[in-house]
Structures are given as C-alpha cells and as structure tokens.
Amino acid sequence: MTNVIVMLEAEDIARSQRIDARNKAITLLPSAFGARDIEDHYMRMFAFNMEMTQKYGLPADGNWYIDSDTGAVVRDD
C-alpha cells in the first residue's frame, strides 16, 4: 500500500518532472552525457531533494520518493 506524505505545489512538480526526464535520458543514453554533466545532474537532484525535505517537512531518513506524474511524495516502506 502506498502512503502519500504530501502533495507538491505545481512549481515543484514541474521541477521534479524536469529532473526525472533528465534522469531517464541519462539512464537510457549515458554516452550522450559527459561524466561532469552526470555528476552535476545528481548534485542538482540531491539539492532538490534536500530542499523538498526542508520545505515540506519530509522525513530526514530519506525513505520517500516523488511520483513525478502526480506530484505525490510517497513513503517508501
């Protein structure tokens, strides 16, 4: 059973979708990105997750993920 913690605001959903799209592209075509681009992407993703943790009061244990399609922050039990 999924446990929705909170729903993101529209602007944060859009940012999450951009990160998710880039993540999928890197996964599918890693050779199209340089090592620096991939590292920068993961640093931006980490910073975004930290920002969302603080903004929405999410658990610091990190056992959650953002469903980019719906904007739901889901507890990953």
Region spans (language model):
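Contiguous, amphipathic alpha-helical segments that mediate oligomerization or scaffolding
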Residues: 1-57
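Amphipathic, charged alpha-helical segments and their helix-to-coil junctions
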Residues: 43-77
